[in-house]
């Protein structure tokens, strides 16, 4: 029997979180998580929670449900006889993207008129190289779903306290020849229990970092890095 690695187990967190596994596969994953070293099990559970929180926020803007045959077709691609680890993540995110962008509009006659351009969420979530990473940020979590192919990411912050008045959270793209690049700011009013933002032009950046900066932000980081999410 091929030995399972910790990396392979963590790769299964996304399809597990999105219910893109069978009952037998879910039971097997549960057994592996229970037997895994505590840091690995904690990392698995953190990613499952982050993916579910992220998709809940991204999909909250629509109440449309995708047609049943679409989800069936997507999940058929993850059957054991044809599945590969790299395809699990793509298929699972494709299923989630269908919910997030409201593909249930097919039932409303969208096929009779030109399709709207894909949203940023759709572009990222359906990318072949989509990845997700999550880290604590204060008492909450910050999650980035990103695609190098699309050069774009989606940031979701859950249960992060707003910055103090007169300051902002500032996001920084780290790495690359130009050093830290500002990826935007969030003031007190912009931070809610579930906050989303789009990250564009990821370029050669290797991480997304957060600092607290005075006023409306700084040209370069001046505060302590509160969280750093790898984008490798």
Swiss-Prot record:
Transmembrane residue ranges: 91-111
Modified residues (N-acetylthreonine): 2
Subcellular location: Cell membrane
UniProt-listed Gene3D superfamilies: Anti-sigma factor, zinc-finger domain
One GO CC term, this protein: peptidoglycan-based cell wall
GO biological process, one term: regulation of translation
Cytoplasmic side: 2-90
InterPro entries, per the entry: Anti-sigma-K/W_factor, Anti_sigma_zinc_sf, RskA_C, RskA_N
Coiled coil: none
Membrane topology according to the record: Single-pass membrane protein
Principal place of residence: membrane
Keywords: Acetylation, Cell membrane, Membrane, Transcription, Transcription regulation, Transmembrane, Transmembrane helix
Any one Pfam family match given in the protein's UniProt record, by short name: RskA_C
Extracellular side: 112-232
Free-text domain note: The cytosolic domain interacts with sigma factor SigK.
Subunit composition and interactions: Interacts with ECF RNA polymerase sigma factor SigK; this inhibits the interaction of SigK with the RNA polymerase catalytic core and leads to a decreased expression of SigK-regulated genes, such as mpt70 and mpt83.
Record-stated family: Belongs to the anti-sigma-K factor family.
Function in brief: An anti-sigma factor for extracytoplasmic function (ECF) sigma factor SigK. ECF sigma factors are held in an inactive form by an anti-sigma factor until released by regulated intramembrane proteolysis (RIP). RIP occurs when an extracytoplasmic signal triggers a concerted proteolytic cascade to transmit information and elicit cellular responses.
Protein name (database record): Anti-sigma-K factor RskA
Encoding gene (name): rskA
């Amino acid at each position: 029997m091929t030995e399972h690695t910790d990396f392979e187990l963590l790769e299964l967190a996304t399809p597990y979180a999105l219910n893109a596994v069978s009952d037998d596969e879910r039971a097997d994953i549960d057994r592996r998580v229970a037997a895994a070293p505590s840091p690995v099990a904690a990392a698995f559970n953190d990613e499952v929670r982050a993916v579910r929180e992220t998709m809940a926020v991204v999909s909250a803007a629509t109440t449309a449900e995708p047609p049943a045959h679409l989800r069936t077709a997507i999940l058929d691609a993850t059957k054991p006889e044809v599945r590969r680890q790299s395809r699990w993540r793509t298929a699972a995110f494709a299923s989630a993207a269908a919910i997030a962008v409201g593909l249930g509009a097919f039932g409303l006659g969208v096929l009779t008129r030109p399709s709207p351009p894909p949203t940023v969420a759709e572009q990222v979530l359906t990318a072949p190289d989509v990845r997700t990473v999550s880290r604590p940020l204060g008492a909450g979590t910050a999650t980035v779903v990103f695609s190098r192919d699309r050069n774009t990411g989606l940031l979701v912050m859950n249960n992060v306290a707003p910055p103090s008045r007169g300051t902002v959270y500032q996001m920084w793209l780290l790495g690359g020849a130009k050093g830290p690049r500002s990826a935007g700011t969030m003031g007190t009013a912009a931070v809610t229990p579930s906050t989303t933002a789009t990250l564009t032009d990821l370029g050669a950046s290797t991480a997304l970092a957060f600092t607290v900066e005075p006023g409306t932000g700084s040209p370069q980081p001046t505060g302590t890095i509160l969280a750093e999410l790898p984008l490798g």
